[in-house]
Amino acid sequence: KIKKAAGAQSMETKEDSTVIVITTDKLGQGAEDLGKVLIKSYTYALAETTPLPKAVMFLNSGVKLTAEGSEVLENIKKLENSGVEIISCGTCLDFYQLKDKLQVGIVGNMYSIIEKMNSAGKVINIG
């Protein structure tokens, strides 16, 4: 009989507790148009692959991706429909005057964002 080493965690459990933080409405530095294409590709691929993250949180201009008019709403809604928590920073939504235009997920505050990050097995920052 094989025993799991003390402190070992299964890959599935670790991956299931991954939190992704998206802090911009485009991916990378340089050409803005390319950055928008890349964030669209990233959110599409994220929604299509497994294992899915536990949560995706949107901060700063990243909240534009969860609001009316976003080109990636379909991808983010697919994540939410698959059980991924979608959280947008309330202060950020207020700053960009988007709180009433939120189309997916919930409004979070810095306390809920920090709580999610602290309880995550891994945090991936995009932005």
Model-derived segments and spans:
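A glycine-rich helix N-cap at a beta->alpha junction
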Residues: 72-98
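Short, well-ordered beta-strand core segments
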Residues: 56, 85-86, 123-124
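Conserved mixed alpha/beta catalytic, RNA-binding, or beta-rich assembly cores of soluble enzyme
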Residues: 3-69
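Short amphipathic alpha-helical segments and helix-helix/interface helices
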Residues: 43, 73-77, 114
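C-terminal binding/interaction regions
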Residues: 110, 117-125
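Short acidic-hydrophobic, aromatic-tinged amphipathic segments that line or gate anion-handling sites
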Residues: 104-112
